[in-house]
A protein has these predicted regions:
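A short local loop/turn or secondary-structure capping micro-motif enriched for an aromatic residue
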Residues: 2-3, 81, 120-123
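Short active-site neighborhood of thiol/selenol oxidoreductases, capturing the structured segment around
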Residues: 1-26, 40
């Protein structure tokens, strides 16, 4: 059975606690509704050897796009390998690291929704300030009904991560503490 649209979730990698929490949100909060609307979700990363689907128990596919072809197609920001947190790891991001983004595209290639982060110090290098999954689904429902969608979304932040994904929050806190040593 073919889908009417695809939700493409671009993420940095399985090492990123923000990405893990976000993928879990799509799996737990959006997958059923997206399927009801005759759509599908696919995660896209440029991390070679990514294990997110297996490690997180995701019920949607993960596509490894080490050339960043999909990211370039949609204008999703790509951090050069030398500037990635894993710059010293051989073969992990040979062509740079895709940053978080969401593209919802119909079967004819029409973009129904797009959001992409621009990494900065204020959003922890592209990790935080993602639109909440429930807001994306709500916006998609409006679009599919032919209504205009507002683009004001609540966004992920440290408080959100702490309350919704406490284990991932601890990883971020440990990373921040390591930077302050």
């Amino acid at each position: 059975m073919s889908s009417d649209f695809t939700v493409k979730v671009f993420f940095r990698g399985d090492w990123c606690p923000w990405c893990s929490g976000y993928l879990k949100d799509f799996n737990d909060q959006a997958l059923h509704k997206i399927q009801e609307l005759n759509g599908k979700i696919v995660g896209i990363t440029s991390q070679v050897g990514n294990q997110s689907q297996k490690e997180l128990g995701l019920n949607f596919d993960i596509q490894i796009d080490e050339e960043n072809i999909e990211a370039k197609k949609y204008g999703i920001f790509i951090t050069p390998k030398a500037e990635t947190p894993l710059k010293d790891a051989d073969g992990i991001y040979p062509n740079g690291m895709v940053q978080p983004g969401i593209v919802i595209e119909d079967t004819e290639g029409k973009i129904l929704y797009k959001w992409a982060i621009i990494p900065s110090e204020m959003n922890l290098g592209g990790a935080s300030e993602r639109p909440l999954v429930r807001d994306i689904v709500s916006s998609l429902e409006q679009i599919l009904k032919g209504q205009e969608s507002g683009n004001s979304f609540n966004k992920t932040d440290m408080n959100y991560l702490e309350h919704n994904h406490p284990e991932e929050y601890k990883k971020v806190q440990a990373y921040i503490a390591s930077l302050n040593k």
